Amino acid sequence: MEERPPENEGPQREPWDEWVVEVLKELKEEALKHFDPRLLTALGNHIYNRHGDTLEGAGELIRILQRALFIHFRSGCSHSRIGQPGGGNPLSTIPPSRSML
């Protein structure tokens, strides 16, 4: 008798869909802080025209946004410590307390 893997029956699991949507939402919010909204809209339209409203399209958009943000941060975004010499100190903007014990 030949062994075969179990058939993948039924629709894809819901939690995966929800996770993809949540990741995409978070990336979009971060991308809007760093890139022109018109550029992001054009990118979204391009992906939608190519893939429609599918998980495949969402995955491609996630990959592109992750790469764009990574490159943006590595080139020295002023909103990030990534790419700056020494990484910068995020606490340096907090003035020292005058009433130290």
Swiss-Prot record:
Q: Which InterPro entries match?
A: RetroV_VpR/X (IPR000012)
Q: Where is this region: Disordered?
A: 81-101
Q: Which residues carry this modification: Phosphoserine?
A: S80
Q: Where in the cell is it found?
A: Virion; Host nucleus
Source organism superkingdom = Viruses
The scientific name of the source species is Simian immunodeficiency virus (isolate Mm142-83)
Q: Quote the biased-composition stretches of kind Polar residues, using this chain's numbering.
A: 90-101
Main role? Stimulates gene expression driven by the HIV-2 LTR. Prevents infected cells from undergoing mitosis and proliferating, by inducing arrest or delay in the G2 phase of the cell cycle. Cell cycle arrest creates a favorable environment for maximizing viral expression and production.
Keyword annotations for this protein, in alphabetical order, are: Activator, AIDS, Cell cycle, Host nucleus, Host-virus interaction, Phosphoprotein, Transcription, Transcription regulation, Viral penetration into host nucleus, Virion, Virus entry into host cell
Specify the protein name: Protein Vpr
